Amino acid sequence: VLPLAGFKKIQPRVYSGFYPVDSNDYQESKKALDKLSLNDNSFTYEPESSQSLGHGFRCGFLGLLHMEIIRERVQREYNLEFLMTVPSVTYRIEDKKGQTLDIRKPSDLPDDNSLKCYYEPIALISIVTPSQYLGSVIELCTSKRGAQQDLIYRSNMVEIRYEIPLSEIIYDFFDTLKSASKGYASYDYDIIDYRESKMLRLDIHVNKKKVDALSQILHKDCLLYTSDAADDTPC
């Protein structure tokens, strides 16, 4: 059987680790995820293990809403509970030998001494908003490391286009945009490129031991902010 001309498999944009709350549910969890992947070709999973959380799965989704839908379906249809790691996008690295590698989870990131460049996925996002909320929307996009590409007025509405790192969109962008526009703005985006960026891995230690499942890959500026916030938090 040959695929239809022009057919392209949907690639996940967001990844998260799913670890059964009860380790005895691993095989049942695998069967459940397998069934879900058969009727949703945009959902992917593969086995992975964590020193702190044990055996689980690295799952791929179209976005956070898709991830939440899968989690709710597994809970409702199969009565299974998961611990979920912080969602992440696929980063790309180049080592000093000139080899490139895609990184889907922070714990796979090699030692900094062996790396030459980090690359992160960039999205072209198109936002339509009433003109009175334009200032708030621009402020939001700028805070997300966005670069304005276009601004088009359409009667009392405005379409504004920005290039923004995908990692800045997948978390709270939708909720913040709705708040900034009183619920009137809408948006759509496509991944257009990978670009060099200053990324670092943030490791979390509990009782002086690194918890690999809690590691995150963050932009250098965000990491400095996170570090300052942690310093202000009492132990």
PLM feature spans:
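Single conserved hydrophobic/aromatic residue that forms the stacking wall/gate
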Residues: 225-235
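Structural and coupling elements of P-loop NTPases
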Residues: 1-227
